[in-house]
Amino acid sequence: LFKLSQRLEVPLDYFFNEQIEIKSNLSNFKQLSARLLDDRNYDDLEYIYRIEIERSTFLTLEDRTYLEWIKAIIDFYQYDSKCEAISSLENILLKVSSNTLIYLKALNTLSNFYSLVGREQEYEANYSHLIELYQTKNLDHQEFLFGYIRVRYNYAHYLVSKEKYNEAIQEALETIELCKQRQTSYQLAPLLILVGNAGAKFLDREQVKNYYIEARELCKIYNNPLMLMKIENYLKELDTV
């Protein structure tokens, strides 16, 4: 499962074009970890991380930094080592270029950590910086598009936590429209659920239900049983109101 693909050299264009990504010896690991992060499955993420760090493969700076980023996530969520995780991410940002994908990933994760520990001013400053950075990126590149969607979803979620429901719904709806324009379902179901939850107090009941139903259909198509179960519970609660 974890056998790495054939090693390829860095293309010369990489040094002149920031949109080109180095061929990585962590290709399989990155694919698996991305899926586990989307599912918030930190147990399995730690398992594959432990396997990966035992390998004696050549790693680029960006690959090594990617593993440091994953370790910070594991430390924060698995071991409650919040200060250490935050410090690790802050150090990552000091040593890699803001043009790289891993910089954007680390900055987004650090922003989330700031939010979770109550450092709201730092979170909001980072969010503004992330939006500025993504405005310079080509969203035809899937990694940039998905990263931008993640940042905006996280911000909508943050607004809900601050009980700024109107702003949260507006942010989520704009991001849903972006998903549809770009013809991607990435984070679309969670965004629809967020609109349903945030709008429960002032949207029409049928409107809320329709957002849940649309999210449910996406979960069926893409086989996401955990999220599907949550949606079914939301619909049951809605029917009892």
Language-model features, listed with the residues they occupy:
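Helix-turn-helix repeat elements of alpha-solenoid scaffolds
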Residues: L36-I51, F76-N91, R119-L133, E163-L173, ...
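DNA major-groove recognition helix of helix-turn-helix/homeodomain DNA-binding modules
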Residues: L1-Y14
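Residue register of alpha-helical TPR repeats
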Residues: S27, Y66, K105, E143-R150, ...
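Structural motif corresponding to the intra-repeat A-B loop/turn of tetratricopeptide repeats
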Residues: D39, Q78-Y79, V117, K162, ...
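Residue signature of alpha-solenoid helical repeat architecture, marking inter-repeat boundaries
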Residues: K23, T60-R64, L101-Y103, Q142-F146, ...
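TPR repeat positional signature
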Residues: F29-L32, E68, L107, R152, ...
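Amphipathic alpha-helical segments of tetratricopeptide repeats
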Residues: Y49-S56, L89-S97, S128-L139, L173-T184, ...
